[in-house]
């Protein structure tokens, strides 16, 4: 039971549902929003509404985009012979920020995790297979996170790709096992990309 006014209590409840935000942090954020100028609070509300209404998945790679094709898929300067497979759009951002890779991406929107009830049919694997079948790729880079589920997903995908005349590689192990790509720094990601190994 909260001692806050109804609107404040509702805001704290909603903020505490965000990843990494506990009740105390949610209270601090709520009270901060009460102190800021009204325009600032309304700008935040507008940005949240806009991201929910305007942002969608790219129709080709499943990156986040405000248009049908994301900025990467619509960039003619990208290397269309290499395809890097990642779990989430935030992984794509981390890899692309390294500046080492200039190819295309495919976002799975998750990883195979049977214990969590996540199966291959819940990911964008069918779309990936179709892209490889119809594309002109010479290399597929498995850039799933170095976790049990990420490694399992990479193995599953590499088995699916055996029928295609492409080289299948995996990021080098400069990224610690069990870690997440979005938290790795640019240098580690660059080393993992340049030192990738054949699967």
Swiss-Prot record:
Pfam families: RecR_HhH, RecR_ZnF, Toprim_4. Residues 81-176 form the Toprim domain. A zinc finger (C4-type) spans 58-73. One of its GO terms (molecular function) is zinc ion binding. Gene3D superfamilies: 3.30.60.80, 3.40.1360.10, RecR Domain 1 (1.10.8.420). Belongs to the RecR family. May play a role in DNA repair. It seems to be involved in an RecBC-independent recombinational process of DNA repair. It may act with RecF and RecO. This is Recombination protein RecR. The lineage of its organism: Bacteria, Pseudomonadati, Planctomycetota, Planctomycetia, Pirellulales.
């Amino acid at each position: 039971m909260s001692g806050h006014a109804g609107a404040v209590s509702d805001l704290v409840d909603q903020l505490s549902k965000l990843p990494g935000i506990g009740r105390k942090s949610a209270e601090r954020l709520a009270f901060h929003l009460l102190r800021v100028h009204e325009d600032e609070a309304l700008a935040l509300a507008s940005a949240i509404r806009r991201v929910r209404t305007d942002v969608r998945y790219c129709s080709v790679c499943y990156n986040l985009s405000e248009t049908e094709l994301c900025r990467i898929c619509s960039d003619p300067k990208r290397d269309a012979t290499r395809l890097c497979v990642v779990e989430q759009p935030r992984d794509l951002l981390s890899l692309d920020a390294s500046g080492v890779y200039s190819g295309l991406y495919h976002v799975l929107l998750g990883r195979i995790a049977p214990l969590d009830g996540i199966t291959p049919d819940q990911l964008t694997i069918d779309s990936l297979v179709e892209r490889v079948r119809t594309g002109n790729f010479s290399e597929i880079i498995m850039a799933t996170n170095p976790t049990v589920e990420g490694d399992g997903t990479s193995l599953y995908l590499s088995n699916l790709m055996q029928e295609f005349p492409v080289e299948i590689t995996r990021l080098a192990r400069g990224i610690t096992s069990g870690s997440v790509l979005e938290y790795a720094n640019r240098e580690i990601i660059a080393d993992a990309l340049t030192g990738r190994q054949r699967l």
